[in-house]
Amino acid sequence: MADRPQQLQVHPQRGHGHYEGGIKNQRGGGPSAVKVMAVLAALPVGGTLLALAGLTLAGSVIGLLVTSPLFIIFSPVLVPAAIVVGLAVASFLSSGALGLTGLSSLSWVLNYLRCASQSLPREMDQAKRRMQDMAAFVGQKTREVGQEIQSRAQEGRRT
């Protein structure tokens, strides 16, 4: 590998380093007719909307200039009134939220009781059966223990 000569490849560049104006248009010439029509259609609409935005801004500034002295003069009345209105709105909203929570809780309890009352007779029957089975088991066990005691007593008498 050391005995091979190194080769340098040089690729010629087009344009020789000067700027050619960005992306080239494949067809040549200016913008297409569709683009020109789109600009001509959008120009009046954009201008109208810009004029309306300017008028709205001017009206807002004039309204603020006119009402600022009124806000300053009536601020001892307006600030407490705004606080009262804010508290009233907050109380109505919290009242509604608490009422909705109460209704949903009541609905859940009623649904739970309805489901429980439907399954209660079945559970009572199961409890009765378990008690009867347990009573029968205890009776059987008592008989067995009694017989065991009798048999041991008889064995004790014999010996």
From Swiss-Prot:
UniProt cross-references to InterPro entries, sorted A to Z: Oleosin
Region annotated Disordered, chain positions: 1-24
Segments passing through the bilayer: 45-65, 70-90, 92-112
Compartments (UniProt record): Lipid droplet; Membrane
Tissue expression summary: Expressed in seeds.
Composition skew (Polar residues), residue ranges: 1-10
Record keywords: Allergen, Lipid droplet, Membrane, Transmembrane, Transmembrane helix
Protein name as it appears in the record: Oleosin Cor a 12
Protein's organism: Corylus avellana (European hazel)
